[in-house]
Amino acid sequence: MKVVQTKDTMSNIYLDAVRIRHQVFVVEQGVPLSREIDKDEAHCIHFVLYSDKKEPQGTVRLLPLENGKMKLQRMAILSEYRHQGLGKILIEEAENFAKNQGYNTILLGSQSTAETFYEKLGYTAYGDPFEDAGMPHIYMKKTL
């Protein structure tokens, strides 16, 4: 298993990330494609987790913000690979990357159904719940 990253939106790594996100968010959850692929794509660092057989299994992206913060977005694991600890591996890789780049805080907007997952990784909820793409979400953050 290996996590790789890219900022190159023409790379195969990025295309694997988009394929995973399309399957999870557009096909499974009904998020409009126009909302899934956004203006921030070229500004993000895209991470993809590959199996030992080089099959893409999951993805997440980080959007650099100001004041030592990064926003974790588009966390997705393909359905056949869920509940195996792969999400934790991806998040930890993204956090390590952010910390090594001098960032000290990760922010995210979690689907409410994933709140417990992020809490187990040290994230805390803040602010009021909100709706995004027709689904309830909660703001969360973690100091690195």
Task: Identify what each model region corresponds to.
Residues 34-39, 128-130:
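Short, solvent-exposed loop/turn elements at beta->coil junctions and helix N-caps
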Residues 100, 112-128, 133-136:
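Conserved active-site alpha-helix within GNAT-family acetyltransferase domains
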Residues 1-34, 41-46, 50-55:
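Short amphipathic alpha-helix that is part of the acyltransferase structural core
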Residues 48, 55-63, 71-76:
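Conserved beta-strand in the GNAT
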Residues 79, 83, 103:
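Glycine-rich ATP-lid loops
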Residues 41-43, 68, 132-136:
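Short acidic/glycine-enriched loop/turn segments that link adjacent beta-strands
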